[in-house]
């Protein structure tokens, strides 16, 4: 470190007393597992980056060819990361749908029994609110997909406005203001998925743009 006036070097220590953030990250992106852990093998069951997530799913592991392998034998197998500071954002991943009742993305999670879900189920795109054991549909629309299809899902939350895009096109949207902040991740109902990549990106709320 150089002095401001004479250019002399100053040696010493800098102590950071606290470090935090507010709001959702500008862009938090995870690539494929092999990009993040080049030493990964098909038998690797955990990594340092996997430990940044909390899982209530039966199985949550790094996948050798994508990023995550997630399975759960019953409804509501949830995996999340993030904090209560995450408010207006979009969460995105490329998901391969295997045999399951429903699967997709989670946002604004306050634990694994209170969150918004955006899933593909029974030829429909569905946005729902999970509150304890009760699941309430916010909006749904027809969406053609087959078992073993791979689709890019993006779940965007801007204030009370919720929308799910499939392969870059809005599939369903609705409004609810029960949850205004919380973490993001995945949900699997009675089945399994592969998830290739994971991105959380802050969005500028329309309310802020008007101010």
What are these regions (language model features)?
Residues 1-211:
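Extracellular glycan-recognition regions
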């Amino acid at each position: 470190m150089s002095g401001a006036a004479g250019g002399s070097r100053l040696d010493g220590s800098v102590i950071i007393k606290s470090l935090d953030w507010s709001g959702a990250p500008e862009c938090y992106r995870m690539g494929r597992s092999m990009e993040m852990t080049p030493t990964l093998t098909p038998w690797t069951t955990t990594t340092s980056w996997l430990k940044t997530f909390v899982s209530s799913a039966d199985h949550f592991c790094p996948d050798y060819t994508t990023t995550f392998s997630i399975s759960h034998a019953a409804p509501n197998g949830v995996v999340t990361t993030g904090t209560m500071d995450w408010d207006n954002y979009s969460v995105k991943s490329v998901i391969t749908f295997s045999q399951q009742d429903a699967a997709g993305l989670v946002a604004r999670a306050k634990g694994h029994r209170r969150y918004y879900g955006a899933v593909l189920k029974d030829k429909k795109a569905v946005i729902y609110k999970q509150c304890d054991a009760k699941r309430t549909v916010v909006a749904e629309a027809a969406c053609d997909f087959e078992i073993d299809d791979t689709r890019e899902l993006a779940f965007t939350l801007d204030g009370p406005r919720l929308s799910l895009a499939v392969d870059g096109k809005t599939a369903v949207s609705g409004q609810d203001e029960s949850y205004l902040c919380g973490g993001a991740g995945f949900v699997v109902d009675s089945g399994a998925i592969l998830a290739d990549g994971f991105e959380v990106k802050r969005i500028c709320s329309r309310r802020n743009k008007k101010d």
